[in-house]
Structure formats: C-alpha cells, structure tokens
C-alpha cells in the first residue's frame, strides 16, 4: 500500500529500457490466422492475370482491407490482415539509428542522488552530453559522474527544459541547452560564466546620509572640499596619459563614500620617456589592479619578453597609485612590496633613482646591513625591495606591514604552488598583485595555472577541473597522432583559455621594439665531438646503469645521474674525470650508483691524466669556443663577450681558458656576494672597462641583468628549461645596445645536448599554444617518440635536429642524394608541411625558416662562422633587423 501522495513516477518520466517489440502488428490471433492459411496457387494466378490483363481497371489495383473478395472459381475469401513490409521497417530503423548516432546535444543540468523524495535537494551543477543513443554526465570540473546507453531516439530528440531523468544512479533536471561552441571552448564549465553580476547588497548600497543636520555646520565646507578634488596633472595637455575612468559597477563596489570622480594622469616626467607599448602596458596594469578588467580580481601578469621595459612600467604604476586615485583623488595604495631575485635588488633601486630621482619617492632595500624592522619604523619609505631568500627569513615581520601592492619580479619561479616561496607570498594580505615574467609557460600548463591562480585565485577553478577542461585537450591536440576532432577541441580550448587569461595577462614580443634595436644574428652551432669524448660516450652508453635505466630497473635518481654524466662529458672530459675520481671511494647510495655508472671510465683516459691541465682538443665545443674568441678579438677588438654556463665547474674551465690566452675577464656566479653583483655589472658595461669577457652563471645572474656592454653572447651549455637559456640570451639585445648582437649556442653533435634542444622547442610550442596564440605560421613539432631516445650517440649524422626537420635543403652534405633515392614511408615521427594538416605549435627558433649551413658549405656569409667551420658539422642561423653590413 502506498503511503505517499506523491506520484509513483516523476512528471519528467525517467527513461527506462523498454521491452523489445518487433516491427509490425503483434496480434496473436492474426499471426495464428496467417499460419493456418495455406497458399492457394489460384490466388497468385489470379493476381498475375489481373496484372497482365489490360481490361482490368487499374484505378483500384489492390482490394480494400476488410472487404470479402472472390478468387478463381468464385469462392469468397475472408479479408487478409495488413502485412507490413519487413525490409521497409528495417530500412527505417537503420535510418533512425544513423540519425541518432549523429545526434549531439549539450544541456546544463542540476543533479542529486536518485530518490523517491518529493522535494529534491540538488547537489550541484553538471553538463549533460547526448551523443547518439547515450548520455554522459560531467560535473563542472570535467569529470564523468554518470553514463547511460540504449535510449530511444525519439526520447533523446525530445529532451527539453524542466525534464527529469535518471542517469547512472543520479537524478537530473534539465535547466537549458548549451551550444556546441560553448562546450568546445569550455565556457560551459566556468562557474558563473559571463560578466559577473554585482551582488545585490552592493548594488543596493547607497551613500550614508546622516538624518540629523547640524545648524552650526554648513554644507559649504564639504562642497568646497569636493571642488578642490582636481587631477594631480592636467589631463588636457598634449601627450597626457590619462587612465580610464571607472564604470558604474566599479563605482558601486569601491566608491562607497560617493566621492567625486577624478582623472588619474601619469606624471608627465615619466610619460616623456615612455614608448607606445609601455603606455599601453601601464593602462593595462592600472585596469587590472583596480579591478576594472576582471570583476572582483585585482591581479595581473605582465609577460612581455625581455627588454621591453617591464621595470619602467611598474615604476610608473607604483608612483601613480601612491599619489593619485579615481575617487576624490585619494591615493589607492600607501606601501608597495617588490620581491625580486637577489641579483636584481640593487638594479631595482637604480631604476627608481634613474626615473624618479631620490626626492620624489623613498626606496628601502633589504640586505645584510638593512633589516625589515628599519622599514617598519620608517615614516617616509613607501617601497620595500627584498629578495626571495630574504623574504622567507623575514616573513613574520613583513606580514605585519599593510602593503597595498605586491610585485613579483621574475615571477616564473612561482610556477609551483607548493614551494615555500609561493606559500609565503600567498599568506600576505595583499589584494593587488602583479607578476613580471618573460616566460609565463616554461615546462607545462600546470605551471601556467600556478601563476594564474596566484595573482587571481580561483579564476580558472580548481587544478583538477583545469586539467580536465583545458590542459588535457590542449596537450592531446598537439600530439602528431591526434585525430581531427581532438585537434579542433584542443584548439577551441586553447582559444578560450587565452581569452579568459587575456583579461589579466599582457604579452608582447620584441617585435614591438625591433625598430629601436640593432641587428641580432642568432647561431646554433653543432660542434663535432672530440675523439676522447666519443670513446667515453660509447663506454657510458654500454654501462650497466644505462642499460638498467632503459629497462626501467632503476629509480629516477639513476636516470638523472646518467644524464648528468653525459652532459659533463659534452662540456669537457676533465669534468667527468673529476667526478669519477671524487666518487671512487664514496659510500653513499647515490654516489655508489654514480660509481657503478663510471666503472671502467678511468682506463679510457690517457695515463697520468690531469684534469687541471686539460687539453682544448679533448672537447669539440671548447675547440670551437677558443677559435671563436680569437676571431672576435681580431675582427672586433672594441667589442666584448658574455660567456654563459649553467655550472660553476664549467665556468672554472672557461676561466682557465681565458687566463691561458690572456683575456681579461669578470665573473658573476652563485658565490658572488649579492651586494657586489650590481657593481660588477656596472663596471663591465662601462666604456672604460678593460674586461674582454664576462663569465656568467645562468642560474645566478641569467635573469634581469642588463649587460649591454657586451655584443657577443656565447651559451656554452644547454638547460632542460628553455626559459633559462632564453633569459640568458636576452641579456645583451635590449635598450641601450649600440652594436650588432651575435648570439652563439654551442651543442655537441649527435649527443644528449641535441635531444635537450629538441625538447626545448617542444616546450616553447606549448607556450605558443596559450600565450602567443595570435601568431600564425607553419611551424614544426617534434614527436614524443623522437624525443625519448636520450641515450643514443648519432655518430653518422651531421645534425640530428636537421634530419628531424625533414628538410630538403642542400645545407647538409649528401642530403639531396638521400632524398632523391625514392619516396620514404610516412611515419608519425616525420615532420613537414606534407605530413599533417594539423595546426602546428609555435617553436622557439622557427627552424624551418632559419638558414641552414653545413660545416662543409663553401663561402659561409658570416666571417665569424667561416673561421670556426673546421670543428663544426652544422649551423642554424637567423638574422633579425638585418642591416646591409653586420
């Protein structure tokens, strides 16, 4: 007996899988009647005669149903029941199935666990995907939470708003339809998509009106005060840079005292030095930190490439916000915190002094002699500049300071939300946040999410939803084996991610300032390995540790040890010798693994080998470097060289080479005191400097430094992270450079360095998919399969990277002969315009458009390359701002 007055089934009619009913009538009596009837030959004979007899009337060729008829000898026969054509029914059902399979609809729904309760308690929003005869239910994080299959096409076609369904143990109610564009772009997964509405409490808020009006106090005082609210600078003067005025929604949220709107004008002293792209950047930053671009969010990422003046744009923003405001002219902030790498603390102080002098604004830099407590007790310092390391030490004191603006220079180091630095900065109660970085996407899209979530928490949802909705479709679409549907979905998701983040991320490339800079000649130089290097490389690849790594029998640390040993060998065998000798009598587990890797290597070295008295001929890259330094010193005696490495031990070798050849050099690495670094840089940039070479550690000083005193930069080794190398190479080609810039990247041919370089290109393509999406060109993408082969020595190739390009140019000796032998079977690992119609990602170097030269090429156009060709197997060259003579 039913106890509830509720209907036994929800009005929406939950779908149930019905019993199968064959086509046609299913009346039992009719079927028996048909079975009992025996076929009469006369019946068919009469039918044939009626068809062939021209005298028979054709107006009614078939007898009517239910009317008795005579056949042959006049016998009356009962009417035949209507029999449906089986072939027609099957054809119609197949057509319906095909139509159902092509059916694809999307709905926004609410869901809860299936129950018989009359009043449902919905647990959350979801997306219903109707595909063919199946349902898929996804939550707003992109996870599948329910599936159903086997529904009728008629039921699927009639799904409408307000209907309730049961799917996978969950009851849902249809709220509305979603367009395919919104689903493919991912907009439907966004919480509160569209322009955020102003809360009713804020929209209804009015200015406080005191009901009692004093007869002694005149209202003229307040009116006079408001009349005195004038812009700090005249907005009507020529070339005045005026910030946008807040709209009505912004005024409801932030102008609680109904103050008059005042124009915010950038100081004309700064505007005089600003370039057009810098003016646009200041307006962008102002709108972001004031909450005008993303309602309720006051963060921004200035992702301009190196050399575009991010520091000057931030200084202009700070000075403006500390002096002006749109509501009654009241300053927006009082104090600013700038967090930067240790080597750039004094550089920021110099930039403030350069653009604003020492009287307009007071800057406090934290170092060993100046503590945070002094800033707390100071009444006239308004900007605190501190390194990331000192921030962690002084976090408790900094938390007590009410900063209105936080600026994180070289903010790509915040790519991991779980590290101490990111956690410490997130604990500060500072609503307005700006990240400065030239490389917003370094390795993967999760690092990009960490940066975005730091400046504007929650704007992309949770990390799990971000992975499902954006990261996975984008990465899958960039694989060479992806389907057309996957590529289209990934492209739409990347476009939507760019649109979302474009509200608070500004990215400009160096193309905007090319006209202000001298020519830049970039060269990727592939150096032939020395005989000792080849012999040691073979020995390492045959070692037990490498074989176990390839079989997956060792832990991850063993992989890193093998890679580290190969990288040391590529720089110089003496570095590997010192490492092997140092681990010979070690006892720790990690050092035992390295000792096992290097067993038998000492026997390959010459007897009595001394790493301190190394030979330049033992390393292919070192031979090229020595010749390159000699030709630069000969042809450009007044120009200087920056020599960059990732490792201090390698810098020691390079410093010894400089001493042998009598080159005066300066050095900046991790052991250089922070207080002395800016002085070393200034001395090298001075025209009175006698140093020919600047030895630079990319880890300690590869970011933010301005080394325009040198015009030749040589990157001796390569890093897994492309941002490290890009930052280091950007130290010389920037504002203030007077000479043509020459950049050389040295790689050992056929070794692990080429594989690392190829992975760098792949990672840069990922950055282009999101941040630089507006660029369009035919670019190459290396397959994952080609990049897995790290532990291989390609001795017969002049350049493995050029081989992967599938380029038919004559740069490589014998390449055209190989290409003319016949068509080669297409594989997923091959590249070129003819291989795939997919939208290829943007690469760092656009190698297809670069010039390709073999080391055996006759008459190289570059005089520097011509002199070092003896030890080089291949060149890639690209010239920016090409001039008649470089």
Swiss-Prot record:
Pfam families: Helicase_C (PF00271), SNF2-rel_dom (PF00176). It is found in: Nucleus. Its EC number is 3.6.4.-. GO terms for molecular function: ATP binding; DNA binding; DNA translocase activity; helicase activity; hydrolase activity. Keywords: ATP-binding, DNA damage, DNA repair, DNA-binding, Helicase, Hydrolase, Nucleotide-binding, Nucleus, Phosphoprotein. Residues 1-12, 47-62 have a biased composition (Polar residues). ATP binds at residues 304-311. Residues 1-95 are annotated as: Disordered. It is an enzyme of class 3 (hydrolase). Residues 627-788 form the Helicase C-terminal domain. Residues 67-76, 86-95 have a biased composition (Basic and acidic residues). This is DNA repair and recombination protein RAD54B. The lineage of its organism: Eukaryota, Metazoa, Chordata, Craniata, Vertebrata.
